[in-house]
């Protein structure tokens, strides 16, 4: 047994030496990497110190320039998700009108060129002169970050958008946008290119309608991955909004495709029971453990709960 014992001991010692040798190599490698990193950082620090970091280095972007330069800060990204988010922001303004009790119908149209048109029968964005800005309130809403009626507790008790950020961001990120307002028997409009007004808000006619129409075409220099809207993505979102805001009727129309009868593809979303009906929709064909959905609703401080 002794020869085997000495052989085993010999092998064990060699293994220990091997482990020790590997640890030494790893330690030396880490030291070299640390020295290289320290040298690199010192070089960069010297380069930075040589740069003229002064007042001229500070950029003050005007208007919507910051939105166009950093769009992901406002809409999440510039891919498919961000592209569809533009629609959500405009629709949210119509939803706010509905929550305030002034809108019953919302229509979203995917046009043949993949531009989007949204229309509601709300009160219409105000078009009279804004005292502080010196331009029409419509132009303020469309071109100023943080502009909107949702900060005024007398105008909106609840809201679902980005509180004035949304529609101006959509305008900034659009190659072209046209806003048409039906308000107090008159039709007003203004068009924009990349967020900048092409002309002052002007009266273009008379009407017995009311509401706001916004048509926008996303800027291809910003949305470089795709400009094509997905019908199912928009349908899913609008369906959820109809459930979350019972009583509202939301129409989705896709002018890129026609059915056999010649009508455009589309569907209408409307819910009488709201979230209660939404739960049934989510259950689908599955057998529920609780036959009847338990739901409560009321009002607190004038806000539906």
Tell what function each PLM region has.
Residues 42-57, 114-137, 148-281:
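GHKL-type ATPase core
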